[in-house]
Structures are given as structure tokens and as C-alpha cells.
């Protein structure tokens, strides 16, 4: 990591100085930033900003000032309040982190810089294509990727190995959805407990259906085609058998209590996975948690959801915009970007960062869970295609209704199955038809 830091510093010193030949102003040009990385006091990004300010910032008379560190939801609301000139709203900063939904909700998207005006085609081509494309809105590069996460499979190896010794379960079974759900059904039969929890049922279907070569969306709704039925069958079978966690909340909780063995969740949730399981009887044990690439369908493409905010720059003056770009080019330079993301558990955003700097950085990591996560990142980036959702105004509504209704229908189906009088096969399709009827298209 020290070597990467030295490379990062050299990049800072080699960046071109703006206004060459002109007299430097006494006061630095200060540009402001709202971000989500850490807290006000303990933030890896704030530490890097301090380094920038004392090196290339000092050379070019630029100072980056962090005005707000919060969560993405709060920043979304604050940006829209400022853009709409709501009473009491703060002024927009020069830079803020954003999902596409924030840009789409702006009253005027033209208030944002188009990064194509400041980055050459070659510079933009250095980014992972899907990461860059997600930030292309209305034909403009409105969002610049900084960090990314994805969805990975977390497994409690201690519990899995204990059960596998008796059942014959294998880690290869965890590489496909068919295998995961078959294990979930078997585990429920053997132990009476859940095996698998997915944080994002909507994403399982969305990415899964697309990986099978079929469109998941149709117009402003969901297309319930043969691919959807293909994804529903093993999912519902495991749910009806009791092997799929159907409660609300995040996947970290049932793994923390031993109520599930395997989860699929955002890789960023690595922060919340514990190496101690506390059981309902208040006993506890140390466990080993590791990660693997997200499962795929046996006959499907290797497709996986990408996640994470990027950075928007607000139009102002050429000087202020150039100052922001100088900072962002530094932060996304491969060596610096790897130093940044590995302090947080995220993925870098350029191919060179993955190929040249990330493997070396992984060798320096000491936490086995993070070593496993970054090995999973490297495998995922090499073998998978990153998927990002379409830009739909009603996307969040479709997602929230889907998550609630899918769990509700399978929970009701599970009750019917336990009461008897219904076969599992019949309930698989009855729950699907009921779900489609209530959800709509």
C-alpha cells in the first residue's frame, strides 16, 4: 500500500498546473464537496483530500473543502431542495455524490457539467464501460464513477462445513442459483432452519431474467415471461420448503444469529458481517465468513448488479470547474483510486486499477474477510459483465412493491404448505399467479 501511496503522490506532482505563467492568487480557490464516505471525523476520503490540498492543491492554488458527509438518501434530498430553491435549503456544492435517480429528478439537468468537456475520449475509455455508462444520462456524462460495489455471496464457512460433512454439500453448489436453492431445500429438511437470505429479491429476478436472454422490464412495468418463470421455480420451491429467509431486514442479521448460512448482499455490507454468531439460547461461537462471486443460472450469462454512487460537478465558472476536474482526475487515477477504495471495501473504477494495482494491494490486506472480498472482486471483474438498471421514473416504486409482495406471497404459501392440502409443485405456480395478479405489469 506504501508503494501505491508513493505512486499516487507522484501523480499529484505531475498533474499540469493551471494558469501557468500567471501570478498565483494569495487565497486558494476553494471548491466544496458533499460525500458519503465515512464520518465527519473518520473519513478515508477526507484524509486523501488533506493530502491533495497539501500537494497538488497547494501547487495549483486549489482547496477542496468537505461541507457535508452523510448518507446517499440525505444528500439526494438536500441536492433536490437546493436545486429547487426550497426555503432554507443550502446552496449546491461544487461537487456531490449521486445516483442516476438524483440527476433524473433535478428540475434542470443542465446545471451539471458534462465530463466529456473535460475528459478526453481516451481518458473516459479507461473506466470500466458499465461503470461509465451508468452515469451517462440524456446523452451527457453527468456522473463520474469513483467507487463501485456489487453483489456477492457471503458464506459462514464454519456452519457450512459442519453441515457439509454430513450432507455432502459442496462449495461448487454455491456457484449457481440452482445449486443454492437445492441446498436451501435440503438444509431446511435436515435442520428445520433457513439456509439462504437474499437482500434484494428484485435484483435476483431482474439480473437473473436478463442473464437468461430475456427482458425483465416492459414499458413502465415488469414483463412476466418464461425467464421470470424459470427464476421463480427454484426460488419459490426453496421458500415454500423453509430454506429461504422471507423476513424483513438485512442479510447480516440472520447470519449473525445463525438463522441462515449463506447470503447474497451488497459487497459494501462487508462492514457489518461479524465473525461471531450469537444463537437464540445466548451461546456464541467464532466463525469464518468468506465471500464468493454471485451465483448465476446454469444456462445463463455471468451477469451481476453493479452498485454505488458517482460524482456530479455543478456548472459554475471555468476556473471552479477546472479545479474540480483536477481533483477528480487525481482521485480516479488508478494508483490513488486503489488506495481510496481498499480503505473502504469498494471496487476501483478503471481497468488499469484492477489489473495493475489491485492485486498488489490485496497482498497487503490483513483481514481474511477483506482478502476474500477482494479476491472475489478480481474474479468477478474478470468473468462477469456488470449490469445496471434502466433509468425509469417509477423504478423505486417497482422495486419496493416487488420486495414486499414477493416475501408476502411466499410466506402465505409456506403457511399453506405446512397446513397440508397443497402440494409444493402446485403452490409454486399458485403463488406466482397470485403475485402477478396483485403486482400488475
State each model region's role.
Residues 237, 241-243, 280-352:
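Extracytoplasmic/periplasmic substrate-recognition and gating elements
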Residues 138-146, 151-153, 178-227, 260-262:
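Extracytoplasmic/periplasmic solute-binding protein
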Residues 27-39, 61-68, 94-95, 142:
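Short, well-ordered beta-strand elements
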Residues 363-364, 371, 375-441:
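Conserved C-terminal helix/tail region of periplasmic/extracytoplasmic solute-binding proteins
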Residues 116-127, 172, 214-231, 237, ...:
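Short, solvent-exposed loop/beta-turn-alpha elements that line the ligand-binding surface or hinge
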Residues 58-127, 162-163, 261-262, 280-283:
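Extracytoplasmic "Venus flytrap"/periplasmic binding protein-like
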Residues 181-186, 218-249, 290-294:
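Glycine-centered hinge/linker elements that transmit conformational signals in sensory
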Residues 97-152, 181, 286-295:
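Hinge/lid segment of periplasmic solute-binding proteins
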Amino acid at each position: 500500500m506504501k508503494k501505491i501511496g508513493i505512486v499516487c503522490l507522484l501523480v499529484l506532482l505531475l498533474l499540469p498546473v493551471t494558469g501557468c505563467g500567471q501570478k498565483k492568487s494569495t487565497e486558494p480557490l476553494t471548491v466544496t464537496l458533499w460525500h458519503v464516505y465515512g464520518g465527519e471525523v473518520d473519513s478515508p476520503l477526507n484524509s486523501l483530500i488533506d493530502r491533495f490540498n497539501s500537494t497538488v492543491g497547494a501547487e495549483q492554488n486549489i482547496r477542496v473543502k468537505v461541507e457535508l458527509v452523510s448518507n446517499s438518501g440525505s444528500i439526494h434530498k438536500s441536492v433536490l431542495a437546493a436545486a429547487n430553491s426550497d426555503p432554507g435549503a443550502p446552496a449546491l456544492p461544487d461537487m456531490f455524490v449521486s445516483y442516476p435517480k438524483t440527476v433524473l429528478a433535478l428540475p434542470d439537468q443542465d446545471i451539471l457539467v458534462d465530463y466529456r468537456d473535460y475528459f478526453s475520449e481516451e481518458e473516459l475509455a479507461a473506466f470500466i464501460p458499465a461503470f461509465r455508462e451508468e452515469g451517462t444520462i440524456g446523452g451527457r456524462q453527468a456522473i463520474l464513477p469513483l467507487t463501485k460495489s456489487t453483489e456477492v455471496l457471503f458464506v459462514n464457512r464454519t456452519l457450512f462445513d459442519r453441515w457439509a460433512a454430513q450432507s455432502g454439500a459442496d462449495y461448487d453448489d454455491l456457484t449457481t442459483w440452482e445449486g443454492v436453492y437445492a441446498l436451501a431445500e435440503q438444509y431446511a429438511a435436515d435442520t428445520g432452519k433457513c439456509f439462504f437470505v437474499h437482500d434484494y429479491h428484485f435484483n435476483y429476478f431482474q439480473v437473473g431474467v436478463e442473464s437468461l436472454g430475456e427482458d425483465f422490464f416492459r414499458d413502465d412495468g415488469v414483463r412476466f415471461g418464461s425467464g421470470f418463470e424459470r427464476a421463480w421455480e427454484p426460488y419459490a420451491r426453496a421458500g415454500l420448503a423453509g430454506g429461504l429467509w422471507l423476513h424483513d431486514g438485512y442479510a447480516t442479521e440472520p447470519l449473525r444469529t445463525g438463522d441462515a448460512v449463506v447470503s447474497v448482499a451488497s459487497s459494501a455490507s462487508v462492514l457489518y458481517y461479524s465473525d461471531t454468531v450469537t444463537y437464540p439460547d445466548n451461546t456464541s461461537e467464532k466463525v469464518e465468513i468468506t465471500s464468493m462471486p454471485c451465483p448465476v443460472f446454469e444456462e445463463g450469462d455471468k451477469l451481476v448488479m453493479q452498485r454505488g454512487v458517482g460524482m456530479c460537478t455543478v456548472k459554475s465558472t471555468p476556473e471552479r470547474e477546472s479545479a474540480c476536474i483536477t481533483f477528480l482526475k487525481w482521485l480516479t487515477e488508478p494508483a490513488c483510486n486503489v488506495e481510496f477504495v481498499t480503505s473502504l471495501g469498494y471496487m476501483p473504477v478503471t481497468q488499469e486499477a484492477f489489473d495493475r494495482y489491485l492485486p498488489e494491494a490485496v497482498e497487503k490486506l490483513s483481514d481474511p474477510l477483506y482478502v476474500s472480498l477482494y479476491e472475489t472482486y478480481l474474479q468477478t471483474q474478470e468473468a462477469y459483465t456488470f449490469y445496471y438498471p434502466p433509468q425509469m421514473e417509477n423504478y423505486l416504486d417497482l422495486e419496493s412493491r416487488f420486495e414486499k409482495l414477493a416475501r408476502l406471497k411466499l410466506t402465505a404459501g409456506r403457511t399453506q404448505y405446512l397446513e397440508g392440502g397443497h402440494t409444493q409443485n402446485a403452490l409454486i405456480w399458485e403463488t406466482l399467479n397470485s403475485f402477478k395478479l396483485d403486482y400488475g405489469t
